[in-house]
Amino acid sequence: MHFIDQAEIEVQAGNGGDGIVAFRREKYVPAGGPSGGNGGRGGSVILVADPGLQTLLDFRFQPVIKAEHGAKGGPNHRSGASGADRLVRVPCGTMVFDTETGELLGDLVQPGDRLLVARGGKGGLGNAHFLSNHNRAPRQFTRGQPGERRRLRLELKLIAEVGIVGMPNAGKSTLISVVSSARPKIADYPFTTLQPNLGVVPHPAGDGVVFADIPGLIEGAHRGVGLGHDFLRHVERTRVLIHLVDGTAADPVRDYQIIQQELRAYGHGLSDKPQIVVLNKIDALEPQEVSERTQRLSMAAGAPVSAISAVARQGLEPLLQRVWQCLGRDPDLHRPAAASKIQPVRGQENLRIGVPLPSQNSEMSGYVYLGGGSAPRFAPDQVGH
């Protein structure tokens, strides 16, 4: 399925039905009064948020969406039938703009949210409406009013609590695939991910949290370079960002700084969101390299850095714990810990991962290893630089 997050459509509400001219004609009533009924109301076009949809692809094939017209009135004071409303399903997170004015008409976030985008025309009046003491046999009637017609721009912003951002090939798709049931395309080359991927990560409380894997950003993404500009909007609704950095890159700190600059340049509060900085692919590094790169990245970020290996499934539980804390959904620490659902890759059970420990001075005072086996904490001066 192709992911389409923008579309332009034209909506046309139904016209109101015309009123009619009719007179009562019955046996022994040669001069019956007016009996022309009113026309029916035209159908309206209404957008409805549907959690089962994740793309605006369908709107590429139906550029004009119409509702039914109202029926004309009938004799004997019968009103015409109203036209049926046209309910149009859109993904949750769809923002609707008037193309001509640029006005935001509505933001359909919750399942079942509705937005009236084109109102049906009122029905016309039959001649019975014009009966008066001065006009006992009126022949006036009115036609139904036309329904509203407008062009709309639909813009989809995915609804996820956690967004995963980073340079191409940082391991974002691998991470979301091991912590959720999402199955994005994964390959060892940049820009494997060409569209956002959503995954629901189980929470210890029993519910789930939606994560979004955003296609890789590169320098100049806020100006439309690469794929980033098209998809940065999808992290606007997130509450927390996981900033994934490739630990095997030539300069992880430089990669981190590039993404931070792009988030600031794009605006919309992205750089102000809480971030969890994560050094990935440490299974491909020596312990000393992990320690050095984690320390440097922590200094650049001014915050602790989680060191993980998504492919080896190491360090993921502590990372998720930090996510729950940022979301204010930290599980009850007093209840017995449930068995981890994230299992290490065979052969990697004893992989030792260096994770920085923050000191009271907000500088890194040491590291602790996560993974199989015991490893003592050690000070930075015990690590070769």
Swiss-Prot record:
Molecular-function annotations in GO: GTP binding; GTPase activity; magnesium ion binding
This protein's name: GTPase Obg
Organism listed in the record: Synechococcus sp. (strain JA-3-3Ab) (Cyanobacteria bacterium Yellowstone A-Prime)
HAMAP family cross-referenced by the UniProt entry: GTPase_Obg
Domain Obg: 1-159
Occurrences of domain OBG-type G (ranges): 160-328
Similarity-based family: Belongs to the TRAFAC class OBG-HflX-like GTPase superfamily. OBG GTPase family.
Main location: cytoplasm
Pfam families: GTP1_OBG (PF01018), MMR_HSR1 (PF01926)
